[in-house]
Amino acid sequence: MKLILASNSRTRKEVLDKVGLIYSVAPSNIEEISTETNPDNYVMDLSKQKAEAVAKEQKEGVILSADSIIYIDDKKLEKPKTKEQAKEMLHKLSGRINYAVTGVTIIDLYQNKKITFNEVTEVYFDTLTEDEIDWYIENEQYIFERCGYSIAGKSAIYIPKINGDYYNILGMPISRVYKELNKLGYKLTDFD
């Protein structure tokens, strides 16, 4: 059985590697456009588009795709392109809760089944001083991270608590993915 990750995301691959899943990578390369405005529906729509694009190119396999966003005040936070944008985002996150939302789609070409779901994790941020924000911007590669922070990086010192799946913040809610694969009749060892 083949498991195909429809993503080139380094962190998603790391999560799958951690649990011992054997998979191949076939990124969808779609233009990520959705008319959905609700964060849950937005990520599910994009994950569906990615999985469907890859499924069209495959004869067999289980396609796994995901799309993630961070939002606060009902607004999606994008990757900062400049230090000024990163600083503005950190001010917005400071002392507040933000939400990591991941939409996941699994298309099982063996059984002709499709599952789409989303996971939400609350991320609590400490109140940051101006010095802490400046230090973070100088010492972290914020420019590569959606919303300017990575819980697996230096920003972990400013996140005292989360409510939900840690791996969801990394873009792959692996516990739920595993449960959904089980519902389809698969174990971790079924993929080669």
Question: Which functions belong to the PLM regions below?
Answer:
Residues 24-32:
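A short beta-strand-loop structural module common to alpha/beta enzyme folds
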Residues 2-21:
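N-terminal beta1-alpha1 ligand-phosphate binding loop
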Residues 3-4, 25, 38-192:
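Anionic-ligand binding patches
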Residues 10, 30, 111:
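Short, glycine/serine-rich, charged loops/turns that create anion-binding
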